[in-house]
Every structure is written in structure tokens, then in C-alpha cells.
A protein has these predicted regions:
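Juxtamembrane intracellular "pre-TM" segments in multi-pass secondary transporters
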Residues: 2-23, 203-237, 421-431
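Helix-loop boundary and gating motifs at the non-cytosolic
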Residues: 7-68, 224, 228-275
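Structural signal for membrane-spanning alpha-helices in multi-pass inner-membrane proteins
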Residues: 45, 100-107, 171-176, 194-202, ...
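Helix-loop junctions on the cytosolic side of multi-pass membrane transporters
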Residues: 137, 141, 180, 184-214, ...
């Protein structure tokens, strides 16, 4: 017992999930791999715009890469609940590595065309449809204590956004001096680190669902489960709305950097890096919190901040003002997404975890292709700034709807938090309702 306490005390509360060996390994491998992922995410739209000069095709390639997530993720969620998530993850990392190396091969042989990028983006989207819900659900198996789950998820978000901060900056330099092909090659090689980390994990075989029903029946059960849980339903609704209308701003960034700010690939990289720095700050803030109490208010405030950030950004023609606004936008985006993920992972029953996280994935990434396609069309018609402005306004309206539902969500989530031990059952009802889902976020 004393050794366990000493091990915990070696890590500050913000990094307490590092007390678990499996989590440390997974975090390390993913951190290096995600830098490569973000390098490729920057290089792909930049190469498309370089080859075509078309905002419509920018949206089309993004649509192709994300539509499989919308179509496949719900079924992937059912299979995630059935199969061993560890082996799903291992397979998706190997497949993603092959996809990146194929892009590099086509680039260096001088044969790459937009249709190649569309097809390979579709393939990556299919991989992500299985990878994301599996990875989100797998985090639960890396920490021993339920109360550390929120910290692990927040640290994962900080890992993603640390990579989001570093990756675009590296991508900007690589594109300028070596071309997009090096970005694809580095991403492909970076998967080696996460594959090694997965092979080194010591995980107990997870009990799989032996009472298997037809996939459509299990999918229907998952939808019914989400519909009956007000917190899960409204959290996923807000994520879907923000992803559909607000997140496509990232697809339009190459155009904004070049046409509005009169910059180049460095400008694009700095803008995305600024957004990543804000997101990193948000993730570290959530990691420093002791539990999920008050996350409902954080979600609503963050969605509002994200929308207002986009509105202000749409009026900016200054590089430095745009950088500052991207920091705020990234902060709002990450606070909403990470807090939503944490609440969902905390309150969901384990036998439904894969399906619920697949619906989260569908809302977060699956709606984005439609948003990207619409944004590309709108940008051709009304311009990039007005398209971003419209998305920001809709995000703020969605946040206001969520805020109006907070009293109902408090009542719905209260018994779950009591059962999990986050709230003492003997505390009076009035105090309980004021102290959990929408408590002042300063615990």
C-alpha cells in the first residue's frame, strides 16, 4: 500500500495517470505518432490547393476523408463492444502507416493526382471509423481507478494538441523546403512508435460480449440507450452541431492564410499552431481538475467561446490578431470536446461504451465531411470570411440551446454521480444540483 502511495506522489495531480505503466507507454507512443499525423493533416489540404487552386476541391477531399466515419462508425462501435479493442487498435495503426507511405510513394514518383488523394482519404476515413471509438474506449483499460479516467482523457487531449501545436509548425517548414512528400513519409514512419508501444503493453484480455445479437439490433439498442440519457443525447447533439458548422474553418485555413492574410505555408502552419496552443491550454486545465463536477457549465461556456472566436476571426485581416483569435478558438474547441468526452466516458455503462463513443465519433468527425463540403461550396459563393462567420453564429446558438437544458441535465446526471461516489448520497438535493453538472468550474 505504501509503495502505491509513493508512486502516486511522484506525479503532480495534473499528471497522475502517469502512475500507470500502460498509460505511460501508450501516451509516449501516441505522442510521437500524432506529431506525424498533424504534419500530414497540414500537408494534405495544402497540396490539394497547390494542385488545383479550388476551395471546392479542398472541401471535397475533406469530405472524402470523413464521410466513412459517418457511415461506418456506428457499426464499428458495435464491433468495438464485441471484439478486443487492443487488436483493433494495433490493426488500425498498421493500416494508417501503409496509407501514409502510399501517399509519399505517389508524391516522390511524380504521379500523385487529386483523385489519388480522394481515394486514400476515403481509406483513411474507414480506418479512423474503427480507430477512434476503439482508442477512446481503450483508455478505460489503461487506468485502474475510475476517478483517474477524466485525467487520462484530458492528458490524451493535451497529447493531441501538443502534437497539433508542433506538427503544423514542422509541416510549414517541410512544405517550404522539401515539399509535401516528406510530410507523408515522416507520418508513415511515426506509426512505428505507437505500434511498438502497443506491443509493450501488459493488458488483461477484456471480456468480450458473448451474447451477440444481429449488428442492426445491437445498433438499435445503442441508439435507444443514447436517446434515453438526456446528458449523453444533448452532449452529442452539441458536438455534432459544432463539428458540422464550426469545425470546417480548418478546411478553409489555406485559403484564409493565402488570400486574406496574404501569407504562405508558414502562415497556415502558424495559424493552426496557434489554435493548437489554445487547445493544449484547455486540455491541461481539464487535466488539473479533480473530477468531472462542473463539466456541464464548461461545455456550454466553451462552445460559446468557440463560436465567438470564429465570429471575430472572420472579420480579421491582421496576422497577429488572427493568431490571438485562433488561440481562443482552439481553447474553446478543446474545452468542449474534451469535457464532453470525459462526461460521456464517466457516465456510460461499459457494455455500451463502444457504441456511445462511436456516436461521439460520428458527431465529432462524421458530421465534419458535410460541413467541409458545404463550407467549400459556400466559400465559392459568399467568400471564406462570411462562411466562417455563419458557422460561428450557429455554434453560439447551439450553445444557448444547451445552456437552456442544463437544469434538466443536472437532474439526470445526479444519480449517476452519486452511484460513482463523486457526490455523497446524504447531501441535500438542492446542494447536489448546484454542485455537479453545471457547478462553477473552479474545483
Amino acid at each position: 500500500m505504501k509503495s502505491v502511495i509513493n508512486k502516486v506522489n511522484r506525479f503532480p495531480i495534473i499528471f497522475r495517470s502517469f502512475q500507470y505503466r500502460n498509460y505511460r507507454l501508450f501516451f509516449g507512443g501516441q505522442s510521437l505518432s500524432l506529431i506525424g499525423t498533424w504534419i500530414q493533416r497540414i500537408a494534405t489540404p495544402w497540396l490539394v490547393y497547390h494542385l488545383t487552386g479550388s476551395t471546392f476541391l479542398l472541401g471535397m477531399v475533406a469530405f472524402a476523408g470523413q464521410i466513412p466515419t459517418f457511415l461506418i462508425a456506428p457499426f464499428a462501435g458495435v464491433l468495438t463492444d464485441r471484439w478486443n479493442r487492443y487488436y483493433i487498435l494495433l490493426g488500425t495503426q498498421i493500416a494508417a502507416m501503409i496509407q501514409a507511405l502510399l501517399l509519399a510513394f505517389l508524391y516522390y514518383t511524380g504521379t500523385i493526382e487529386v483523385w489519388h488523394m480522394v481515394i486514400l482519404s476515403i481509406i483513411l476515413g474507414c480506418i479512423n471509423a474503427f480507430d477512434i471509438p476503439s482508442r477512446q474506449s481503450f483508455v478505460v483499460e489503461l487506468v485502474d481507478k475510475k476517478e483517474d479516467l477524466g485525467n487520462a482523457i484530458a492528458l490524451n487531449s493535451s497529447m493531441v494538441n501538443g502534437a497539433r501545436l508542433i506538427g503544423p509548425s514542422i509541416a510549414g517548414v517541410l512544405i517550404a523546403f522539401t515539399g509535401e512528400g516528406m510530410c507523408f513519409l515522416i507520418n508513415g514512419l511515426s506509426y512505428i512508435f505507437v505500434i511498438i508501444s502497443l506491443l509493450l503493453l501488459r493488458v488483461n484480455p477484456r471480456k468480450t460480449n458473448t451474447n451477440k445479437q444481429p449488428i442492426l439490433k445491437e445498433l438499435k439498442a445503442g441508439l435507444s440507450y443514447v436517446n434515453k440519457s438526456l446528458p449523453i443525447k444533448y452532449i452529442i447533439f452539441l458536438i455534432g452541431l459544432v463539428s458540422l458548422t464550426g469545425m470546417p474553418y480548418t478546411v478553409l485555413m489555406p485559403v484564409f492564410a493565402k488570400e486574406i492574410l496574404h501569407g504562405d505555408s508558414h502562415t497556415f502552419g502558424f495559424l493552426m499552431g496557434a489554435s493548437g496552443s489554445g487547445a493544449l491550454a484547455g486540455a491541461l486545465y481539464l487535466a488539473s481538475r479533480k473530477n468531472v463536477l462542473g463539466f456541464g457549465k464548461i461545455i456550454s461556456m466553451a462552445a460559446t467561446l468557440f463560436g465567438l472566436g470564429l465570429i471575430a476571426f472572420s472579420f480579421s485581416s491582421s496576422f497577429y490578431i488572427s493568431l490571438g483569435l485562433m488561440v481562443l478558438t482552439g481553447l474553446g474547441m478543446m474545452l468542449q470536446m474534451a469535457a464532453s468526452n470525459t462526461v460521456l466516458q464517466t457516465i456510460v455503462d461499459d457494455h455500451m461504451r463502444g457504441r456511445v463513443m462511436s456516436f461521439y465519433t460520428m458527431a465529432f468527425m462524421g458530421t465534419a465531411p458535410f460541413g467541409s463540403l458545404i463550407a467549400g461550396i459556400l466559400a465559392d459563393k459568399i467568400g471564406v470570411p462570411n462562411t466562417i462567420l455563419l458557422g460561428g453564429i450557429i455554434c453560439v446558438l447551439g450553445a444557448l440551446i444547451f445552456i437552456s437544458k442544463l437544469p434538466e441535465l443536472r437532474k439526470a446526471v445526479h444519480p449517476v454521480y452519486v452511484r460513482l461516489g463523486f457526490i455523497p448520497a446524504e447531501i441535500s438535493s438542492g446542494i447536489q444540483e448546484a454542485s455537479e453538472f453545471s457547478a462553477t468550474p473552479n474545483e
